[in-house]
């Protein structure tokens, strides 16, 4: 890893935890071009901290077929509970890849850099949780394999979202519970603290930012894991509609190999 120029290692003096936190936050902010700030909150590092593993990812790309700003108009966005909120809805007739399933539809919008934006829209405003529950790698592949190029009437809300998550419970549910248990964690492959005490994970913090507008999408994500000691146009052929005026899932993926960089849900909250 030290030979990889994208990996940065530095030793710190945890006798000054706030200085350490500031240095890590500055590194993350620089790598995400200012979009992820204060990844680590005050007092998240103390003198028992032995290792902080931080990752950062920034994505910014223009649409291959941009939306026209003058077409953006206020429209209601219906949330899962049936209430409506105003949304700035981007609108365009465009050639895009589209698929329709039993309970929803998928739209693929291209970026100029070879990445794609996938939006998965349930038929009903209350259908997002059911659609998510059915989404597995296999079902996602079936959706993408079904995509076909056609003319689509696209409505997509402009949105900007920031979120912060503590991933400890999610990672534990995925089989990493031992890593967070001071009595069972085994990081002997990494080493021990200078006082010989074993290491364990105390928390895993993840922050995200995404901005979707007429010209481009910008997204950023950062994760920190802390290790401590025990202490209406003319008719067109095959016209489809994709009106994202209620909750939907979205992903930014590599258009060649399908790798998911970002995923989220637009719920109107």
Task: State where each predicted segment sits.
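Non-catalytic, conformational "gating/processing" segments within enzyme and secreted inhibitor domains
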Residues: 1-130, 145-234, 239
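Feature captures eukaryotic membrane-trafficking machinery centered on endolysosomal pathways
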Residues: 108, 236-269
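Extracytoplasmic and endomembrane cell-envelope/extracellular-matrix remodeling and assembly machinery
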Residues: 133-134
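C-terminal, non-catalytic macromolecule-binding modules
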Residues: 137-140, 171
